[in-house]
C-alpha cells in the first residue's frame, strides 16, 4: 500500500511533464567546451534520475549519457544509450539509443535538433518474452530548452506510419497515420512556467483479432495546460519523493527466509512528518491545471463490415484554477454529437427514440477548500503508506472522516451551466445552482431548472407500444407522472415545453414545481 501511494504521487507529479523531457540538456555556458559538456552531462543525468523514479522496480532506465563537443565549435552531440522501460533484469520496452544536438542560444537556452532514435520498439512481458513491436517514422523534431527552468519552453515532434504488431499472431494490432506532440510555454518569472502541451493523432485503426470487430478514429486531439508551475519546487519535491521511494522500497531478495519477501522498512517519525509536509506543499506548485480531449469520426464495425456504432464528435474537459489559493474553482464538461447505435436492442422504436444522439453537460464547482482538503490527506498519508494492511485501512477511514469534516465546513457551490440532451423525439435542457449542505438529507440545497420538448411525442409512441412491450408500459406511467408535475408553456417555435423546477430545501424537502415528491411518488 505504501509503495502504491508513493508511486501514485510520483506518477501524478511526473505526468505534468511530457516524457520527451529525457531529450533535454542543461548546463551553464563555460569558457571551455569540454567543461560545458561535462556540465551538460551532469544536468541530463540529474534530470533522468528525477523522472526514472529509482525506488520503483518497474520504471524508465538508461545505461549512459555521453556529451561530445561538435566539430562546429558551437553545439554539443548528446547520446543516451540503453534507454528502456522495465525491471533491473528485464526490459518490457527497449528504446535503444537516442541522439540529438544541443546548440546554445543566448545565455539561458538551447536549441534541440537533429534527433536520431530507433524507428522500432520491442515490447516484452515481465517474463522477457516478446509480445509486440511498434514501428514508426519521425518526420520532424525541434525544441527550445530553458536552462534556468530545466524544462522545454517549446517542442514539436512529428511522427507518421505508427504500426503495432503482436509477436504471436499475424496482422496489425493498430495503425496511426500521423501523430504529433507539441508544447508552447513561457517563463512568467521567478522560475514559474506557463505551458500548453498538445497531442494529435489522425487515422487510427484497430481490429480485435478475437471477433474481428474494427475501430476507426479520424482524429484525436488532447491538450494539457498548467499555469505558474514552480519548477524549482517541483524538482525538489520529485527528488524527495524519489528518496522516499528508494528508502522504503519493498525488498525482493527473499532475505526473510524460506524464500519469503521481507517486510518493507517502517516509516520513521521524521519521515512521516516530511511526507505529510510534501502533501501540504503540493497546492503551491501551480495555480491552474487542466486537460481536454476531443475525438472526431469514431466508428465501430463488426467482422462483416456492419456499422455497430458511430460518433461524429465527442469531447471531455476538466480544469482547476486557484489551486494555490484558499478557494479553488473546478470545471467539468462533456459533450457528444452524431451518435448512432445499431443492434438488436435498438430495433425497438422506443429505445431508438430515446437514444441521446447529442448532448452536453457543463459543471462549475466554486469555493473548493483546498487547504482543509489537503490537510486531511496530509494527516492520513503516513498511515496510508504503511506496509501494515490494518494500519492502512484505518487510515482510509481517517481520511474519509477528515474530508467529510472539511466539506461540512465549506461553502462549495455547484453551478450547472446550460446543458442538454437531444434524442430523435425530444430535447431536455437543464441549468441551476446547488450549495453543499452536509446537514441536510440530500447534502445540498438549491434549484435546478429542466425543460422538456417532445413529451407528447414520446407519450404517443410509448402508448402505442404498451400492450406488447412491458418497458413501454412502464414508460407511460413515468411520463404520466411527469405530465402531472409539469408547468406547460409554449416555446418560440409553437411547440409545447414542459418545465420542471427541482428544489432541494433547507428542511430536506425535494420539490418539483412546488409539489413534494414524497406526496406524489408511489
Which role fits each region the language model picked out?
Residues 1-14:
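Bacterial N-terminal signal peptides that target proteins for export
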Residues 22-25:
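C-terminal motif of bacterial Sec signal peptides marking the signal peptidase cleavage site
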Residues 27-522:
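Glycine-rich, small/hydroxylated-residue low-complexity segments
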Amino acid at each position: 500500500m505504501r509503495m502504491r501511494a508513493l508511486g501514485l504521487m510520483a506518477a501524478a507529479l511526473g505526468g505534468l511533464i511530457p516524457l520527451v523531457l529525457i531529450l533535454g540538456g542543461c548546463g551553464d555556458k563555460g569558457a571551455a567546451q569540454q567543461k560545458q559538456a561535462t556540465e551538460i552531462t551532469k544536468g541530463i543525468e540529474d534530470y533522468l534520475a528525477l523522472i526514472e523514479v529509482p525506488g520503483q522496480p518497474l520504471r524508465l532506465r538508461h545505461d549512459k549519457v555521453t556529451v561530445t563537443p561538435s566539430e562546429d565549435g558551437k553545439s554539443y552531440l548528446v547520446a543516451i544509450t540503453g534507454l528502456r522501460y522495465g525491471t533491473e533484469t528485464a526490459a518490457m520496452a527497449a528504446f535503444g539509443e537516442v541522439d540529438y544536438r544541443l546548440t546554445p542560444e543566448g545565455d539561458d537556452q538551447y536549441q534541440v535538433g537533429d534527433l536520431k532514435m530507433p524507428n522500432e520498439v520491442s515490447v516484452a512481458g515481465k517474463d522477457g518474452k516478446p509480445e509486440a513491436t511498434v514501428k514508426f517514422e519521425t518526420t520532424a523534431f525541434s525544441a527550445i530548452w530553458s536552462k534556468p527552468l530545466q524544462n522545454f519552453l517549446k517542442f514539436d515532434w512529428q511522427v507518421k506510419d505508427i504500426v503495432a504488431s503482436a509477436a504471436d499472431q499475424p496482422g496489425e494490432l493498430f495503425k496511426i497515420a500521423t501523430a504529433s506532440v507539441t508544447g508552447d510555454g513561457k517563463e512568467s518569472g521567478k522560475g514559474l512556467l506557463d505551458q500548453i502541451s498538445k497531442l494529435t493523432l489522425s487515422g487510427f485503426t484497430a481490429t480485435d483479432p478475437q471477433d474481428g470487430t474494427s475501430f476507426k478514429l479520424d482524429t484525436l486531439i488532447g491538450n494539457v495546460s498548467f499555469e505558474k508551475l514552480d519548477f524549482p519546487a517541483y524538482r525538489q519535491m520529485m527528488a524527495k519523493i524519489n528518496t522516499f521511494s528508494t528508502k522504503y522500497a519493498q525488498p525482493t531478495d527473499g532475505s526473510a527466509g524460506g524464500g519469503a519477501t521481507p517486510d518493507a522498512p517502517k516509516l520513521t517519525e521524521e519521515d512521516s512528518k516530511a511526507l505529510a509536509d510534501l502533501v501540504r506543499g503540493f497546492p503551491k506548485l501551480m495555480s491552474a491545471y487542466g486537460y481536454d480531449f476531443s475525438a472526431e469520426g469514431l466508428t465501430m464495425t463488426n467482422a462483416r463490415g456492419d456499422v455497430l456504432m458511430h460518433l461524429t464528435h465527442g469531447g471531455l474537459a476538466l480544469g482547476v484554477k486557484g489551486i494555490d489559493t484558499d478557494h479553488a474553482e473546478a470545471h467539468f464538461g462533456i459533450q457528444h454529437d452524431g451518435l448512432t447505435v445499431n443492434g438488436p436492442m435498438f430495433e425497438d422504436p422506443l429505445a431508438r427514440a430515446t437514444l441521446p444522439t447529442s448532448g452536453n453537460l457543463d459543471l462549475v464547482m466554486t469555493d473548493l477548500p483546498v487547504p482543509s482538503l489537503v490537510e486531511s490527506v496530509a494527516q492520513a498519508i503516513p498511515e496510508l503508506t504503511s506496509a501494515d494492511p490494518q494500519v492502512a485501512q484505518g487510515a482510509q477511514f481517517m481520511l474519509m472522516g477528515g474530508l467529510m469534516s472539511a466539506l461540512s465546513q465549506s461553502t462549495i457551490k455547484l453551478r450547472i451551466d446550460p446543458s442538454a440532451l437531444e434524442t430523435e423525439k425530444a430535447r431536455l435542457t437543464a441549468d441551476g445552482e446547488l450549495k453543499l449542505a452536509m446537514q441536510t438529507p440530500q447534502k445540498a440545497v438549491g434549484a435546478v431548472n429542466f425543460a422538456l420538448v417532445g413529451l407528447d411525442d414520446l407519450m404517443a409512441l410509448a402508448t402505442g407500444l404498451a400492450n406488447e412491450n412491458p418497458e413501454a408500459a412502464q414508460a407511460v406511467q413515468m411520463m404520466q407522472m411527469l405530465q402531472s408535475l409539469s408547468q406547460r408553456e409554449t416555446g418560440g417555435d409553437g411547440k409545447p415545453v414542459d418545465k420542471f423546477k427541482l428544489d432541494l430545501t433547507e428542511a430536506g424537502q425535494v420539490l418539483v414545481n412546488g409539489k413534494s415528491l414524497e406526496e406524489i411518488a408511489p
